[in-house]
């Protein structure tokens, strides 16, 4: 039987989670959290994020030695070797920064904590990952088309979109990594957060709205405003603005519209700010 590469040790049960198990779990969660166009990229980032834990130094550290070992940059190097730019760059920022935050880009000969500076460092051999983890093939052309969509020939828009998607991928990766780590390392079984049932939520909203009396002129006006908002929300658009006065029921009306749109467009989540 080959060497066991440990990612985490549960201090309560003394059980170990292998690097392979953690990377595969993180990859699946990262894909689950991502929008459809980013799922494959998110999966690859999750698969590669802890490749550096295959270093001998990290394995000595996880087994009790009081030494410091940098591991996150190794995954960034690995995706840089596997995938072309700018796809690999997006993953590199996220993987290198998944413990400390997205680093500055830096320049070719840097020796600081920028992405370039960190990737210029020398690390122990971590090629053992190739025996346990297979980084997936990605559809480069499809991803490039998604990145360029809606940007036209405007370079600033393209840069802004790349920056936004990098931060989005970073959020997916950090959430996936911390969720899997927490679930393994806690003393009791963790109940995964529930997935909202938008159909049932909409039913409850409708029951509550139907329970309101519509007798006074104010109540009738409020009902008319809400119905107008519901009708207009069926028109196809990317952004909707609800301009209703205080006390007219914007909170419930906006919640109902969001649920209706989420169901109709098969969205996975609603973000309420």
Report residues per predicted region.
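Accessory nucleic-acid engagement/destabilization modules that flank
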Residues: 1-204
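Phosphate/oxyanion-binding active-site loops and adjacent basic polyanion-contact surfaces
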Residues: 18-23, 67-72, 218-225, 247-251
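Conserved pre-motif I regulatory segment
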Residues: 22, 208-243
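Short, hydrophobic/aromatic alpha-helical segments in well-folded domains
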Residues: 29, 228, 257-258
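Hydrophobic helix-cap positions at the C-terminus of alpha-helices
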Residues: 33, 232, 261-262
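Residue-level preference for the first positions of well-ordered beta-strands
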Residues: 41, 239-241, 269-271
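Walker A/P-loop
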Residues: 235-260
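Conserved SF1/SF2 helicase motif Ia
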Residues: 257-273
């Amino acid at each position: 039987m080959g060497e066991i590469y440990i990612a985490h040790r549960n201090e309560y049960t003394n059980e170990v989670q292998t690097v392979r198990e953690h990377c595969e779990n993180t990859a699946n969660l990262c894909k689950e959290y991502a929008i459809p166009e980013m799922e494959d990229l998110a999966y690859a980032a999750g698969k590669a994020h802890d490749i550096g834990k295959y270093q001998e130094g990290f394995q000595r550290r996880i087994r009790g030695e009081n030494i410091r070992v940098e591991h996150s940059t190794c995954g960034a190097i690995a995706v840089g070797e596997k995938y072309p730019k700018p796809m690999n760059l997006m993953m590199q920022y996220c993987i290198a920064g998944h413990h400390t935050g997205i680093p500055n880009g830096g320049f070719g000969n840097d020796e600081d904590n920028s992405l370039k500076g960190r990737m210029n460092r020398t690390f122990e051999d971590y090629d053992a990952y190739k025996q346990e983890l297979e980084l997936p093939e990605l559809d480069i052309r499809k991803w490039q088309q998604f990145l360029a969509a809606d940007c036209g020939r405007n370079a600033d828009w393209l840069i802004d979109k790349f920056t936004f998607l990098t931060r989005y991928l970073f959020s997916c990766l950090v959430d996936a990594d911390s969720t899997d780590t927490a679930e393994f390392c806690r003393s009791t079984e963790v109940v995964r957060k529930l997935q909202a049932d938008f159909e049932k939520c909409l039913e409850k909203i409708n029951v509550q709205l139907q329970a309101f009396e519509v007798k006074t002129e104010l109540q009738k006006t409020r009902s008319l405003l809400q119905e107008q908002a519901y009708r207009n929300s069926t028109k196809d658009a990317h952004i909707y603005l609800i301009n209703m006065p205080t006390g007219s029921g914007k909170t419930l009306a906006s919640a109902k519209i969001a649920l209706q749109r989420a169901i109709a467009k098969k969205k996975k989540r609603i973000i309420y700010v």
